[in-house]
């Protein structure tokens, strides 16, 4: 057994997040577990082979699909600390032992409302927006570009979340395509040519993703003009 604390704070802060992972990846083995179970397996074999997107989904989890989702309603909506929450500043995944170049996946801001961007091992530079992120907020910063879209989505979650999900799905599909292209071409490149190619591929995807989120933010702002309380419905007969 692995020993640790087992107090009330763990039942709210730690154990529910482990439970969420077991429900996602090993539900057939975790049928008797509850969010506050104190005896949880330290190692558990998943029911299926996990992909990089499974890892991303876990780190973005906020108990969606359960009564414990903070985005829901009811007495249980804020009972447990989720994995992804508004205080998340950035999230990282290291994808190792790849046949070509390893990948550092980086999500800026709230990962549940962001996109994991792949940066290849061996790059020599990153886009300028990824080098900025100080206060006050500035929209030439990758962090604030993602955060801007996130807070806009939060303002009218029911209407805007599907638009965000569409962008996330498109960007994930583009990542798969870009990585496959990189893996296909990389074996023929060496030295400086390899580094230049990896940098160009990473930069291109990162920049396209920032542009996608900028476009989303403008779309959301445009739609939000219809939600303004300072409005008046003119009689159609006038």
Give residue ranges: language-model regions:
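C-terminus-biased signal that marks the final domain/tail of proteins
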Residues: 1-238
